[in-house]
């Protein structure tokens, strides 16, 4: 068990924010080498305790949009705010999990997770305790000294989730996190991801998911933005008003899938 004083010392596992939300205002983006606008005038916000999804056809810049939200690349136009303060540079308060399973093969599971704590300047012994706690949270107790090549794709993705959460972010960005997993593993993680990221032992307050899988989106989301067109803009916003856990046997589930699919067909 990690001592409470360690979590508080580095602001790990606790947060003093009353409301944590990410807001973007009229975001647009063009690649520096091209005048083509990828997406234009995207505005929305996430609220506390909410998982928001973004869906759209291939080529509408969804992954690029997450990189802009995380300040890895600057927007061509528009502004980003976290809890009311403008964000212009990368911050550990916003974590991004890429669609490729990004683990460093020469590091153990524990060392992969500890890597994220360098941004918090945590002492080595305390970083180990905090990282072990996060590995426990994602179900990898006993695999601390295993290397990625010794682990399944699902286990490596759990390492990526633990590494994203260990630095105490308040916003988690998920870019197709299950796309490279087999269906059984993906379904297992989908069932766990909502309760995992909003676990009381993490600081996370909201999450944004990009996905092409509409079943996945309806299963996980509180709210969905549909983007379409050239350049991409928001064409629909859908609130998923279903109790959890959600079942595909519920006719309402497929009503939401059909509604999202209709939005994707706009401008074809």
Predicted features along the sequence, with ranges:
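The feature captures the beta-strand-to-loop junction immediately N-terminal to the Walker
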Residues: 55-57
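Helix-to-loop junction immediately C-terminal to a conserved catalytic motif
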Residues: 70
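Conserved ABC transporter NBD signature motif
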Residues: 78-90
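Conserved ABC ATPase "signature" region
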Residues: 114, 125-143, 192-198
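Conserved ABC ATPase signature
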Residues: 147-151, 155
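A short, proline-enriched helix->beta-strand linker immediately N-terminal to the Walker B motif
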Residues: 166-170
């Amino acid at each position: 068990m990690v001592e409470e004083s360690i979590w508080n010392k580095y602001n790990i596992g606790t947060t003093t924010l009353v409301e944590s939300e990410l807001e973007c205002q009229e975001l647009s983006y063009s690649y520096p080498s091209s005048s083509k606008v990828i997406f234009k005038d995207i505005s929305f916000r996430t609220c506390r305790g909410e998982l928001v999804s973004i869906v759209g056809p291939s080529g509408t810049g969804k992954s690029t949009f997450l990189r802009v939200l995380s300040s890895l690349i600057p927007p061509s136009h528009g502004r980003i705010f976290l809890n009311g303060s403008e964000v212009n540079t990368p911050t550990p308060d916003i974590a991004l999990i890429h669609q490729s399973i990004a683990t460093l093969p020469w590091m153990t599971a524990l060392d992969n997770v500890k890597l994220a704590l360098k941004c918090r300047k945590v002492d080595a012994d305390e970083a180990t305790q905090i990282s072990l706690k996060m590995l426990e949270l994602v179900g990898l107790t006993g695999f601390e000294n295993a290397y990625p090549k010794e682990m399944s794709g699902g286990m490596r993705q759990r390492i990526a989730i633990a590494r994203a959460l260990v630095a105490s972010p308040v916003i988690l960005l998920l870019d197709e996190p299950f796309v490279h997993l087999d269906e059984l593993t993906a379904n297992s993680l989908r069932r766990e991801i909502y309760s995992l990221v909003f676990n009381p032992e993490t600081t996370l307050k909201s999450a944004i998911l990009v996905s092409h899988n509409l079943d996945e989106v309806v299963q996980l989301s509180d709210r969905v933005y549909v983007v379409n067109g050239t350049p991409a803009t928001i064409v629909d916003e859908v609130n998923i008003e279903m109790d959890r856990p959600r079942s595909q046997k519920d006719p309402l589930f497929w009503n939401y899938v059909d509604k999202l699919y209709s939005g994707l067909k706009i401008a074809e």
